[in-house]
């Protein structure tokens, strides 16, 4: 199964060249400021990509989904939107959640290490094969240019329970784009935009 991963396109989706694959996954921040017109433009683009399966979760910039979920979901006719839920595709159990530790008072934020955030993280089923979050786990592809590790500690702890996990896809920290394999799990920071919000990074392809 060929998984193509993107994230943090921030209104620059038209400049992204999508390679062929079986499942296309966008790990959030499709918009710049979360406006409905920005989201509609993204959906038009994402819907038009010829893939058997296209999966999307929200990111902290995607205010329209946070405030007007029903209206947004109606637009996504051939897109699988995951918000604290799973889908099984050809034997792969895929779970998506947008929640992250508080970050600059954006959408989908909860206080770091809080009970509220822990409740969201604990919903991830232990038999998940592919996990999609917007923010990274602590210490994995989560460093800013200043060297600060900004990932989620609760998410890192949860990974110990996910014995069948093959991939974890996220974005959020643009400057730590890339792939890391640890304990037989492929971690993908799929941020398309750089720290300066230039869409210079390429989609990341992983065979599962």
Can you describe what each PLM-predicted range is?
Residues 6-89, 161:
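Core catalytic region of metal-dependent phosphoesterases/phosphodiesterases
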């Amino acid at each position: 199964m060929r998984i193509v991963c993107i994230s943090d396109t921030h209104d620059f989706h038209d400049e992204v060249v999508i390679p062929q694959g079986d499942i296309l996954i966008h790990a959030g921040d499709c918009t710049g400021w979360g406006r409905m017109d920005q989201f509609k433009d993204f959906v038009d683009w994402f819907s038009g990509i010829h893939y058997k399966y296209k999966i999307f979760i929200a990111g902290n910039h995607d205010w329209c989904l946070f405030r007007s979920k029903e209206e947004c979901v109606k637009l996504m006719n051939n897109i699988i939107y995951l918000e604290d839920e799973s889908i099984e595709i050809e034997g792969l159990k895929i779970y998506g959640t947008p929640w992250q530790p508080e970050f600059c008072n954006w959408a989908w934020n909860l206080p770091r290490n809080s009970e509220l955030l822990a409740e969201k993280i604990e919903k991830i089923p232990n038999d998940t094969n592919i996990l999609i979050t917007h923010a990274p786990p602590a210490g994995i592809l989560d460093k800013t240019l200043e060297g600060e590790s900004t990932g989620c500690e609760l998410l890192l702890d949860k990974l110990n329970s996910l014995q069948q996990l093959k991939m974890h896809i996220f974005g959020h920290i643009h400057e730590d784009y890339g792939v890391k394999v640890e304990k037989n799990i492929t971690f993908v920071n799929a941020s398309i935009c750089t720290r300066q919000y230039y869409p210079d990074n390429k989609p990341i392809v992983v065979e599962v």
